[in-house]
Amino acid sequence: MMSAPLEIETHPFPALLPPQATVMMMGTFPPKEDKRAMQFHYPNFQNDMWRVYGLVFFNDAAHFQMPAEKAFDAEKIKAFLRERGIASCPTVLKAVREHGNASDKFLQVVETVDLAAVLAQMPDCRHICTTGGKATEILLDIQGGGIKMPKTGETVPFPFVGRDLTLTRLPSTSRAYPLNLAKKAAAYRAFFEMAGLCEKQL
């Protein structure tokens, strides 16, 4: 008996592309609906992305959490990203979850982002950061220039469609990635300092 073909899923959340953005954060694919604590990127309450942002910009890991709820405040997050000029865009538009979970290891990519079309909407964007290895691999494939895979925390030149961009590979904020919250926040802080979006700590 043949097994049923695995479902091709479409990314449920659109990119957030502030026209004045100077930085774009790019990940892969969100968890299934039952693991989402809000309707926006990095929605799993066990994922530390928005705790990292809270620490970096407000010195408060709970800044983007809903009071007394195990959920993040999507509208507060979006307003902050728009105000600071930070875009959030997936590298993957369609994919198959080979094991039915959010693991990049078992994510079969069907369709990737049209990076040129995305960047065309943000003429001032100069810095791209990825939130894990898979997103980094996808962007290097799209760029097609033989750039060596950067190590976690490393920044490399990323020339694309006539623009001199940088690409920084940041650690995954998934709890499955073996790095504590403070060290993840330090890596993201270093990136945002480099991009001029937060002041260096003395």
What residues fall within each predicted segment?
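Active-site catalytic pocket residues across diverse enzymes, especially alpha/beta-hydrolases
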Residues: 57, 142-143
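Short, surface-exposed acidic-centric catalytic microdomains
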Residues: 34, 38-107
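Internal catalytic-core helix/loop-beta-alpha segment
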Residues: 83-142
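Amphipathic alpha-helical segments that form well-ordered structural scaffolds
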Residues: 52-56, 135-138, 190, 194
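Short, conserved, surface-exposed binding loops centered on an aromatic residue
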Residues: 16, 78-81, 121
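Structural motif
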Residues: 22-23, 127
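N-terminal nucleotide-binding beta1-loop-alpha1 segment
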Residues: 25-28
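C-terminal capping/extension of enzyme domains
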Residues: 1-15, 19, 31-36, 43-45, ...
